[in-house]
């Protein structure tokens, strides 16, 4: 079926068949036909982010955020340079969390709420998450095609934990073949 679709596309458009994808938008794709498995990761993307934000030699952390973190909005504006740096860090972390790292989605979403009024503490926590990624850089999502696991969904919420506006945070993840296919925290 795929070959038929490719043939039709090649007849209609000028295109080349470059074979199986190994890299897509910074996400590395590794296949094993015998095991019927696919792994996706962002190891190179994370390494480049650590280099960009001068954290390549920093000590890693064991969790995305320390236990008991309570974030509040800034009362004083941050300098434009620091604000831009914070927003760049948040954007970098959001891309990783959307691509292959559901383990940081909650932490990044919480910090992104302060994208217009962060504090130095928020900035330290974005670096904390990046240090966590450093320590877990080899983490990947594995889709096990030999598994009989169907679509499974999980969800949770915290009911008004945000101290600024009392909004709840909720999260969900859906898996197929034992690998996450969709996740979100908001």
Where are these regions (language model features)?
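Long, low-complexity, charge-biased intrinsically disordered regions
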Residues: 1-186
């Amino acid at each position: 079926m795929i070959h038929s679709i490719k043939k039709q596309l090649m007849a209609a458009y000028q295109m080349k068949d470059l074979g199986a994808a190994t890299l897509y938008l910074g996400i590395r794709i590794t296949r094993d036909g015998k095991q019927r498995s696919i792994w996706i990761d962002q190891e190179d993307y994370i390494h480049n982010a650590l280099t960009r934000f001068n954290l390549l030699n920093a000590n890693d952390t064991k969790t995305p955020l320390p236990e008991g973190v309570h974030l509040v909005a800034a009362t004083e504006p941050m300098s434009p340079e620091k604000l831009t740096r914070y927003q760049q860090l948040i954007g970098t972390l959001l891309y990783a969390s959307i691509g292959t790292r559901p383990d940081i989605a909650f932490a990044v979403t919480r910090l992104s709420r302060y994208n217009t009024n962060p504090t130095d503490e928020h900035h330290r926590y974005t670096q904390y998450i990046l240090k966590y990624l450093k320590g877990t850089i080899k983490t990947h999502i594995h889709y096990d095609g030999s598994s009989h696991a169907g679509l499974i969904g999980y969800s949770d919420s915290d009911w008004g934990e945000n101290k600024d506006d009392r909004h709840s945070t909720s999260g969900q993840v859906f898996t197929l073949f034992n690998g996450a296919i969709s996740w979100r925290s908001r």
